[in-house]
A protein has these predicted regions:
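Short glycine-rich, low-complexity segments
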Residues: 1-57
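HINT superfamily self-processing domains
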Residues: 2, 15, 68, 73-79, ...
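Small/flexible residues
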Residues: 6, 77-80, 88
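Acidic/proline-rich low-complexity IDRs
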Residues: 11, 70, 91-93
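A sequence-level detector of short linear motifs
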Residues: 31, 59-60, 87, 102
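Short beta-strand-initiation
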Residues: 44-46, 72, 88
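Short, conserved turn/kink motifs that form compact alpha/beta structural patches or helix kinks used as
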Residues: 48-83
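Structured surface patches comprising rigid loops and adjacent beta-strands/short helices at the edges
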Residues: 66, 87-101
């Protein structure tokens, strides 16, 4: 049986809030959640998202996470191709980088 992996929407942070930077000691490109202060070329890691809008349409694209509001379970994302900034509700996220998200 070939199923795609599923996660709870509460684990969304592990997929959306990654950083990418160049390590000054080794010169290698690193990926993680907290970058050191001495890191160079620090930028957010892009990810593919598919989510449901408030009007019921499915929207998708490659974007980066700009900010998170944990009390409202919302995050601001900027689409890479268009530069459009949108607010996405965590419970309406269907898929991130091939991993399906479910609500309880």
């Amino acid at each position: 049986m070939n199923q795609r992996p599923t996660q709870s929407y509460t684990a969304l942070r592990r997929y959306c809030e990654k950083w990418q930077w160049t390590d000054p000691r080794t010169g290698l490109r690193q990926t993680g959640y907290v970058h050191p202060q001495t890191a160079r070329d620090v930028e957010r890691m892009p990810f593919f998202i598919k989510f449901l809008t408030r009007t019921g349409h499915v929207d998708q694209g490659t974007c980066v996470c700009l900010s998170v509001d944990p009390l409202r379970h919302q995050r601001r994302v900027r689409f890479v191709e268009s530069g459009e900034v949108r607010v996405v509700n965590d419970v309406l996220v269907l898929e991130v980088d091939g991993t399906r998200f479910i609500t309880h």
